[in-house]
Amino acid sequence: MYNSVLSGGEGDFVEKKSRFIGGGYFVKSEEEALNKISQIKEIYKDATHNTYAYIIGEDAKIQRYSDDGEPQGTAGIPMLEVLKKEEMRNVLVTGTRYFGGILLGSGGLLRAYTKCARLGLLAAKKVVRENFNRTKFSYDYTYHGKILNYLTINGYKILQEEFTDIASLTLYVKENAPIIKDLKDMTGAKIKIEVKACEELPTIDGKL
């Protein structure tokens, strides 16, 4: 389980005639991050600077940044600090600048690129990524109504339904979630439970 973003997005603002574009992107590897940076540089190839910072891995083992020609320590590092403060993982933030003719100074640049990182995270939508088991529950029809009611009350979304001589439902279930014990109790243990796969999924306030 770790803090990250849903997908990707951008926001922009103007500071003393310079236009800044802040981007945020979900990346699972350094290769993905570098590919995205190349895409950004191609899209904004006429920009004065294309800066970035990223943290890869749940252990935050890979951390990189670039000032891309801005004074040392005024762009990449403040963006990386935003990621660290938010405890973000597998996230790339970018800061693109179109120079407007007025120098911002070190403090002004630091604030502007910090804002780029925050805008990027906001646009990409902050989430918590958690592991879920894709789980199939099979049981006699006599329990179907009770089980559906339980799922509705507890906010579960049904991924797949099968109706043969028995009823089967497939759901995303967190590790050690009470649903396993609850449905066993509800059916007197007359329920078949099969974990099909473990998947990493984005959640907001603990919900898919």
Question: Language model features by range: what are they?
Answer:
Residues 23, 52, 90-93, 134:
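Structural motif
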